[in-house]
Curated annotation (Swiss-Prot):
Belongs to the geranylgeranyl reductase family. FAD binds at residues 11-15, 44-47, 101, 125, 288, 300-301. It comes from the Bacteria. Catalyzes the reduction of a single double bond in the isoprenoid tail of menaquinone (MK-9) in M.smegmatis, likely the beta-isoprene unit, forming the predominant form of menaquinone found in mycobacteria, MK-9(II-H2). Its EC number is 1.3.99.38. Keywords: FAD, Flavoprotein, Menaquinone biosynthesis, Oxidoreductase. Its cofactor is FAD. One of its GO terms (biological process) is menaquinone biosynthetic process. It is an enzyme of class 1 (oxidoreductase). Pathway: Quinol/quinone metabolism; menaquinone biosynthesis. This is Menaquinone reductase.
Length: 409
């Protein structure tokens, strides 16, 4: 059976469901299509930064968030030092959270459904059709049926199968991430701090360009994981599952870990807007599909929620009829400066000696680590007037001017 909607959203994760909710609230007839049945799991650290918390509050989820664990900031460990940094930045809530993706994604999807978006779950989009002017006029499902649309939002994740059909290209000369996470029982599962171990070593003792994490979930378990940065020239030199098991053994006594990590899932993450082909006449890529992932920590939920809202606003504003250049331009206005300088810093971390030399120095400076937490947490806005924000924006402008490939191009 074929159907039709004003807006079709492919993907019911945080980005797609946020876009669907905002578009439905603007009066659009919305259909969300996802290959999975919900609830479903997703490879993720489950962390919700203060910026992500702010977006969830915009969606009306404040009361739901109040029932979840709250974290005051980030505890960082490594190179012989430990430091706790409260979440900085004047423009966002003072706390973060962590919610398993089986719960978070289904909750945001339910918000979109309550707002009027229709759900087609367990249904995969495999292709699109175009009208005579080149606009997408329908998505093709794996059973051969179609869903017609006036506008299309693609939020099908980092690999973005539909994005590739539409012409998305991933440029691997900048950094990308590889990561794995699991869940493990710990008596510290209700701690009000998330922990990152910045001195991530392989079982052979080699310092890796990445970090390990322990994110308390408040349910008796922590999200445990490891992630590493890589480039086409310097691919990740680590087998992820053995590395996570080794990391768990290192943390076992300190965290009272019980058993082995369960439900291990890994991911490959394009980062920092390292894709082109993110829009066409009546379609846009958002969230992970548009490589909206922080190059310094692999976080993407806040960008997914934001780009979902921004895409819906662009679609429903009535002022733009062709998104081919409007959407990349909007993404660049919001994220290109930060992504550009973050990609350069992350690239330095892939150099074998850089982290070993700079890590011990940085970890002994509360000022440097406060700056690091703020930029890693995406906690700088254009409205912030303090010196850290001004320096970060200036560095982003300078970095963008010398980019061989600007983010999203």
């Amino acid at each position: 059976m074929n159907t039709r909607a004003d807006v079709v959203v492919v993907g019911a994760g945080p980005a797609g469901s946020a876009a669907a909710a905002w578009a439905a609230r603007a009066g659009r007839d919305v259909v969300v299509v996802d290959a999975a049945q919900f609830p479903r799991d997703k490879a993720c650290g489950d962390g919700l930064t203060p910026r992500a918390v702010a977006e969830l509050q915009r969606l009306g989820m404040a009361s739901w968030l109040d029932t979840r664990i709250r974290h005051h900031g980030l505890r960082m460990s490594g190179f012989g030092a430990d430091v706790e940094i409260p979440w900085p930045g004047p423009s966002f809530p003072a706390t973060s959270s962590a919610v398993p993706r089986t719960e978070l994604d289904d909750r945001i999807r339910s918000v979109a459904a309550d707002d009027g978006a229709k759900m087609m779950l367990g249904t995969k989009v495999v292709d699109v059709t175009h009208d005579s002017s080149g606009r997408v006029d329908a998505v093709v499902l794996d059973d051969g049926n179609t869903v017609g649309c006036a506008q299309l939002i693609v939020a099908d994740g980092a690999r973005s199968t539909l994005g590739r059909v539409l012409g998305r290209t991933w440029h691997r000369e900048t950094v990308y991430g590889v990561a794995i996470r699991g869940y493990i029982a710990s008596p510290r599962a209700s701690e009000p701090w998330i922990t990152s171990h910045l001195e991530l070593r392989s079982p052979e003792g080699k310092v890796l360009p990445g970090y390990g994490w322990m994110f308390p979930l408040g349910n008796g378990e922590v999200n445990i994981g490891v992630g590493a940065l890589a480039t086409a020239k310097r691919p990740a030199d680590a087998a992820l599952r053995p590395l996570m098991s080794y990391y768990a053994d290192l943390r076992r006594e300190e965290w009272g870990l019980v058993g082995e990590p369960r439900a291990g899932l890994s991911a490959l993450l394009p980062m920092g807007g390292a894709v082109s082909g993110v829009a066409g006449p009546n379609w846009m890529l958002i969230g992970d599909a548009a490589a909206c992932v922080n190059p310094l920590n692999g976080e993407g939920i806040d960008y997914g929620l934001e780009t979902g809202r921004l895409a819906a606003e662009l679609m429903t504003s009535g002022g733009v009829t062709d998104y081919s250049s409007a959407w990349p331009t909007l993404l660049q206005e919001h994220y290109a400066r930060g992504f550009s300088v973050a990609r350069r810093l992350a690239l330095l971390l892939t150099l074998p000696r850089f982290l070993q030399v700079t890590g011990p120095v940085a970890m002994r400076s509360a000022t440097l680590m406060t700056i690091a937490v703020r930029v890693m947490g995406n906690l700088v806005t254009d409205e912030d007037a303090d010196w850290i924000a001004r320096v970060w924006r200036t560095a982003g402008l300078a970095s963008r001017r010398i980019d061989q490939r600007v983010p999203f191009s």
